[in-house]
Regions:
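A conserved acidic beta->alpha catalytic loop
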Residues: 66, 75-83
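Acceptor/aglycone-binding surface of glycosyltransferases and processive sugar-polymer synthases
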Residues: 101-109, 135-188
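Active-site-proximal specificity loops/subdomain of glycosyltransferases
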Residues: 88-118
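The conserved acidic donor/metal-binding loop of glycosyltransferases
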Residues: 129-135
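Acidic helix N-cap motif at the loop->helix transition within catalytic regions
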Residues: 48-51, 80-88
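Short aromatic/hydrophobic "clamp" motif used to bind/position activated sugar donors
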Residues: 125
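Well-ordered alpha-helical segments embedded in enzymatic catalytic cores
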Residues: 52-56, 111-115, 142
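N-proximal low-complexity "stem/linker" segments adjacent to membrane-targeting elements
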Residues: 1-59
Length: 188
């Protein structure tokens, strides 16, 4: 593939959340597809952010626009109140150790992602991080949009230009490197 073909491929397969606003058309596309959607947040000790994330997504995407059907938190053994906060904001919460206990314990975020497949009820699962400090519903509908508007798309991976902490400094950009350097080229 030439460099020009590569850039054309990226251009044709890169979406911006604003392409799916207003949400009414996206909701109609979802309803026509009869597809159910779960938003899942694997979490461990995210009390500082989980409440705001669940509240914003519940109000906007579950109650107002009805774009998603459930918000699920899969907790990896939090000791800081994450579970209680997520439940109080309306999320369905499952503890990793209670899901497929016969498989034994795993470790890290991967366990939460894997076990969420067994507790989420949606035909689609939209995973988002539980430590997002600037949450906005567009983080979810920007991922769902391509799936509901282009039948040839079966997988969507977000990338963000966001600040990243390196050593003791905060760089203005730098997030999204794994997606840009590995995921997108491999999935091509």
């Amino acid at each position: 593939m030439s460099q020009l073909d590569t850039w054309e491929w990226f251009g044709n397969r890169t979406f911006h959340y604003s392409q799916f606003e207003p949400l009414a058309a996206l909701r109609e596309a979802r309803e026509r597809s009869a597809t159910t959607v779960s938003v899942c947040l694997p979490a461990r000790n995210e009390a500082a952010t989980i409440g705001q994330i669940v509240r914003v997504l519940r109000r906007s995407l579950l109650e107002r626009s009805r774009l998603v059907d459930e918000i699920v938190v899969v907790d990896g053994g939090s000791s800081d109140g994450t579970v209680a906060i997520a439940q109080s904001e309306g999320a369905v919460v499952h503890c990793e150790g209670d899901v497929l206990p016969e498989e034994g314990p795993g470790s890290g975020k991967g366990e939460g992602l894997w076990k969420s497949l067994h507790v989420c009820h949606g035909d689609l699962i939209c995973w988002i991080d539980a430590d997002i400090r600037n949450i906005h519903p567009r983080f979810v509908y920007g991922l769902l949009g391509p799936l509901f508007t282009d039948p040839g798309i079966v997988y969507v991976k977000a990338f963000y230009e966001r600040p990243i902490r390196e050593r003791n400094a905060l760089r203005a950009t730098g997030g999204g490197r794994v997606t840009e350097l590995l995921a997108r080229p491999v999935l091509n």
